[in-house]
Amino acid sequence: MNPKLNPKRQKSPYQSPWPWWTQVLLSCWRFSWLVFCRWTPKFFNPWRILVLKVFGANLSGMPFIHSKARIQIPWNLTMKHRACLGECANAYSLGKIKILEGATIAQEAYLCTGTHDFNDPSLQLITKPIMVGKNAFIGARAMILPGVCIGDHSIVGAMSVVPKDVPNHQIVAGNPAQKIGERTTS
């Protein structure tokens, strides 16, 4: 097994890989987001940022987190100034997710840091980090797979599946995502 894959050891594929105290903290997080944030209007963004910071999210400047965004494990999320996590976007942060300055994750996009080791009979959980570069744009319903780095100023088209890194200034789309152009910046 590749040590870079960061497997979380499970005794059984039918049990959580997380210790009981992490499960309690995750339950508190889900309850808090539902009660204190999910219903809030757009201008309550500073309140949502505060709640995320209380649960360990690393947020700098003024990122925007939509009230209907889903964040699995907030202490694995880093967002920089002007980064945006859109409506119903899903940061499935079993591993680290880093969204740099000015990057946009559009509605219903899915950043997935977790998968399973299909060569292991117990299907061990494997996590790999995701990084979205400065001023990158992830289109609606796009899926970014574990371990992917989206380069600065890159664009991922709507409903694309991205299984590998996207270099700076590239435009990709499709399943699997393929280069369809270059993005120029002024």
Segments predicted by a language model, with ranges:
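Glycine-rich phosphate-binding "P-loop"
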Residues: 64
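Terminal amphipathic alpha-helical/low-complexity segments used for targeting or macromolecular assembly
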Residues: 1-61, 135, 153, 175-186
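Residues that flank catalytic or metal-binding motifs in active/ligand-binding sites
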Residues: 107, 158, 168
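Acidic, glycine-centered active-site loop in nucleotide-sugar glycosyltransferases
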Residues: 168, 173-176
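Flexible, glycine/small-residue-enriched loop-and-beta-strand segment within the central core
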Residues: 39-42, 48-49, 68-80, 84-149, ...
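A short, terminal or domain-edge coil/loop segment
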Residues: 16-21, 116-127, 154, 169
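Beta-rich strand-turn-strand
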Residues: 140-164
